Amino acid sequence: MDKPFRIYITGKPGIGKTTLLFNIYRILKEKNWRITGFYCPEVRVNNTRMGFKIKSVLSGKEAWLARVDARSGIRIGKYYVVLEDNFVRQLEEEIFSFPDIILIDEIGPMELSSVSLKNLINKILTSNYPVIAVVHRSIKFDDGVIYEVTIQNRDILLEEILGRVTSNKNNI
């Protein structure tokens, strides 16, 4: 049996990893791919980062992942991880609803500090579904193709990754 299709996108903060993943999402969506997964946008109030949400790619449902003003939960930097297990269970149902591909933004220390989210990420990465994930630069995987986004290559990676994804769709 072939190994599951995996692409990991990594690089320095602010280099364009999320932008690249959202462009991949947009183009695959236009081609009628069924896309599931999650992403973790920052939440700002008056230009101050207050925390991060976690949002479903499929439904747009969201919950708090981490907040600066919480006082319980695992602390990562100035944020406290407050993700509720119930939301992760709902997210899991959506993610495994027969997708063509699963997108994750991102797999990092904050996401992995939630036991329920870490378990979901492990379940995704051990599934047979194809996955494209943005990965924190401190985390390494050896079961797929790794793209490091740089200023020099960030404009050409979109076509390269899309070519790899679409050429593999028949094998997915």
From Swiss-Prot:
Disulfide bonds: none annotated. SMART domains: AAA. It holds the Pfam family NTPase_1. It comes from Sulfolobus acidocaldarius (strain ATCC 33909 / DSM 639 / JCM 8929 / NBRC 15157 / NCIMB 11770). The keyword Disulfide bond does not apply. Keywords: ATP-binding, Hydrolase, Nucleotide-binding. GO terms for molecular function: ATP binding; ATP hydrolysis activity. ATP binds at residues 11-18, 101-108. Has nucleotide phosphatase activity towards ATP, GTP, CTP, TTP and UTP. May hydrolyze nucleoside diphosphates with lower efficiency. Its EC number is 3.6.1.15. Belongs to the THEP1 NTPase family. The keyword Nucleotide-binding applies. NCBIfam families: PRK13695.1 (NF010248). It catalyses: a ribonucleoside 5'-triphosphate + H2O = a ribonucleoside 5'-diphosphate + phosphate + H(+). This is Nucleoside-triphosphatase THEP1. The lineage of its organism: Archaea, Thermoproteota, Thermoprotei, Sulfolobales, Sulfolobaceae.
